[in-house]
């Protein structure tokens, strides 16, 4: 069973979507049979497309393209009368018999081979087709390979063993394969965008390695304490395995929470990624314990690689020290102020964030034919060519007065600010619905284009009162504006839901009011800094070439929502793994400072390793040619760095030192009604200890 991914990002029932459906219904005869591709030509220097020789070359190429049985029709530039003012640029339109997703690679290769004729003749020839892509936008597996290699190095240095480093990679790949297979099969039944596969691969690989890391780390601790292999496997699965299940559930909840936005493609992304995370969790708690039982003492802490031992200095006198934790604890106020101030400064660009959707002009490299076609069309017709608007004018009657009113409305629309050109009103078969095409002066992401769409919709109020004619706007630019608006409206609701859920969840886990509050505020700090950094590099264009972005452009409209859903789960994971140990020590000793010191020493190293592994996987995806995947990879890399290293490893211990015993305050009445949640399975340890104590007493 093959895959059937969709690349269209759309939201049903937006104003632009409704207008588009009216056009489809009323102007059926004008609708293309299938996908359309523009073949853009630029004449050689000192020549025009009107030259007989140039026209002959173009005609030959178009005839060759027509030979493809999948092609329905081909319209030449002269036929469409679309030459630029200087007659040097024009485009042909190739219409296929099938929709974009059904256009085969063979058909794409056919058209790519055909245009080599005009290219060889010195006529620049480029292709652009909306949902029909000709340049390779896949990650080709290289991004995953880079991430896995870096993760392997981090694991090898963490555990001082190549064998131990390989186990999390192995189980993560198994989980990833299961998740990917499930998503690919799912595309045959529901609409799933191809970017969902990349997002799921990112998360599935990262959490798969991290979750295995936590369980293996606990297994080795038990072996070091003298437990047998079966006991160590059981305890590691019961304790760290329980924490992994909790961690996985928080990530899954965050991803499934994307469905509250009621945006279909976001829901599909969330469900796809959640399925892969679920596969990673199941492999970690089912398959990994079996593998640990097989390798047994071969991965015990004493079995260290000599080469890595020399490089890391493992086993030397400072091996058990925690210099960073000690530094933070000695200067908590200064560290807190500096860390919060740093994140606040990095967050500043967030306040001028401009959301948009991908276009060939902002997401494609100049090495791609789509981007070169985009630039040629811009050169010929201006930025507004890519932001064409279709206005639907609806009347209740089909009379001569209606037609006159429509013509008047078309002229009035032409007088609106930033309008480059307007076509006459074209009547539909019913005589009640007219279509008016508007070309703005500005591009699809320009605020002036957004203002123009708003002005047309505002004018509808006037025409309804005066002529009983409703105006509706559609077109790619209008669709994008509506999608961005819908996402912007969903963002605060989704953020409030996630933050509220995180607070309640952590109150249950830590039985404290202030620690969850600190965790949530830390999450908001890291989120703000992440979006600030992404705006600085992607939207403002600073050093964008270093990161491989072809041009500065708006932030992907759905990136903030996705980032909140994913970062919520990861942030809560780090908080739980770090603070759970602190709570355990505080419960036994009542000493808040000792709890923080021991928590940082015991859990800090694993949290750092987990953060580095996450970052290595996400950095790998920043190497992807597709700027959508690249921007998601960048955002998640910054998000993990800020949250794991600045918030959890710096601000959390510093603030907890300042709070002292009050950090663990919980009203007695609330303590009585809250259920006890044993995230790390410590009750298992207590039962084992009690059992061993009884055996010891019996043998005395």
Feature-to-residue mapping (PLM):
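Structured non-transmembrane domains adjacent to transmembrane bundles in polytopic membrane proteins
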Residues: 12-35, 43-129, 352-544, 554, ...
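Membrane-embedded transmembrane helical bundles of large multi-pass transporters/channels
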Residues: 1-3, 71, 87, 97-355, ...
């Amino acid at each position: 069973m093959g895959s059937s991914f969709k690349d269209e990002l759309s939201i049903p029932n937006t104003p632009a979507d409704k207008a588009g459906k009216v056009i489809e219904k009323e102007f059926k005869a004008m609708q293309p049979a299938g996908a359309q591709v523009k073949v853009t030509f630029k004449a050689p220097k000192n020549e025009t497309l009107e030259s007989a020789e140039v026209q002959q070359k173009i005609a030959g190429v178009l005839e060759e393209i027509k030979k493809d049985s999948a092609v329905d029709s081909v319209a030449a530039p002269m036929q469409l009368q679309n030459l630029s003012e200087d007659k040097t640029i024009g485009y042909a339109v190739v219409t296929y018999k099938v929709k974009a997703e059904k256009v085969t690679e063979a058909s794409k290769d056919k058209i790519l081979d055909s245009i080599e004729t005009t290219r060889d003749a010195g006529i620049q020839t480029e292709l652009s087709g909306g949902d029909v892509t000709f340049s390779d936008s896949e990650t080709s597996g290289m991004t995953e390979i880079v991430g896995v290699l870096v993760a392997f190095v981090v694991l090898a240095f963490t555990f001082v063993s190549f064998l131990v480093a390989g186990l999390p990679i192995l189980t993560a790949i198994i989980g990833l394969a299961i998740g990917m297979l499930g998503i690919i099969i799912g595309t045959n039944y529901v609409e799933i965008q191809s970017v969902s596969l990349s997002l799921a691969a990112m998360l599935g690989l990262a959490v798969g390695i991290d979750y295995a890391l936590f369980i293996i780390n606990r297994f080795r601790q038990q072996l070091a304490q003298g437990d047998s292999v079966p006991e160590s496997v059981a305890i590691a699965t019961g304790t760290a395995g329980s924490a992994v299940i909790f961690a996985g559930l928080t990530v899954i909840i965050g991803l499934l929470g994307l469905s509250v936005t009621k945006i279909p493609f976001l829901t599909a992304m969330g469900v796809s990624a959640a399925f892969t995370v679920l596969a990673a969790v199941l492999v970690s708690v089912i398959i990994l314990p079996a593998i640990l039982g097989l390798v047994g003492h071969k991965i015990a802490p004493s079995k260290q690689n000599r080469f890595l031992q020399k490089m890391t200095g493992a086993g030397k006198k400072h091996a058990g020290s925690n210099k960073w934790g000690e530094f933070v604890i000695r200067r908590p106020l200064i560290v807190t102020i500096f860390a919060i101030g740093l994140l606040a400064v990095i967050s500043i660009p967030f306040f001028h964030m401009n959301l948009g959707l991908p276009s060939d002009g902002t997401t494609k490299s100049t090495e791609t034919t789509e981007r070169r076609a985009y630039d040629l069309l811009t050169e010929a017709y201006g930025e507004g060519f890519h932001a064409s608007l279709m206005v639907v004018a609806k009347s209740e009657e089909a009379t001569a007065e209606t037609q006159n009113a429509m013509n008047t409305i078309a002229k009035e629309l032409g007088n609106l600010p930033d309008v480059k050109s307007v076509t006459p009103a074209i009547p539909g078969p019913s005589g009640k619905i007219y279509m008016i095409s508007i070309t703005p002066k500005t591009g699809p992401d320009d605020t002036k284009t957004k203002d123009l769409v708003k002005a047309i919709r505002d004018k509808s109020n006037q025409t309804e009162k005066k002529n009983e004619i409703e105006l509706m706007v559609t077109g790619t630019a209008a669709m994008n504006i509506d999608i961005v608006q819908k996402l912007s409206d969903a963002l605060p609701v989704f953020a409030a839901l996630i933050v509220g859920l995180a607070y309640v969840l952590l109150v249950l886990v830590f039985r404290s009011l202030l620690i969850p509050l600190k965790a949530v505020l830390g999450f908001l700090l890291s989120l703000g800094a992440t979006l600030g950094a992404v705006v600085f590099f992607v939207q403002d264009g600073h050093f964008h070439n270093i990161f491989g972005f072809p041009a500065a452009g708006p932030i992907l409209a759905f990136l903030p929502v996705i980032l909140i859903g994913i970062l919520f789960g990861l942030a809560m994971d780090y908080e739980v793994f770090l603070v759970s140990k602190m709570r355990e020590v505080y419960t036994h000793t009542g000493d808040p400072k000792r709890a923080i010191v021991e928590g940082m020493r015991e859990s800090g190293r694993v949290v750092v390793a987990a953060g580095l592994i996450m970052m290595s996987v996400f950095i790998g995806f920043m190497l992807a040619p597709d700027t959508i995947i690249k921007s998601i990879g960048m955002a998640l890399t910054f998000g993990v760095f800020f949250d794991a290293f600045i918030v959890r490893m710096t601000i959390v211990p510093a603030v907890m030192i300042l709070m002292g015993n009050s950090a663990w305050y919980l009203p007695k009445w609330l303590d009585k009604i809250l259920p006890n949640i044993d995230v790390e399975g410590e009750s298992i340890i207590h039962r084992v200890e009690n059992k061993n104590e009884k055996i010891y007493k019996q043998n005395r």
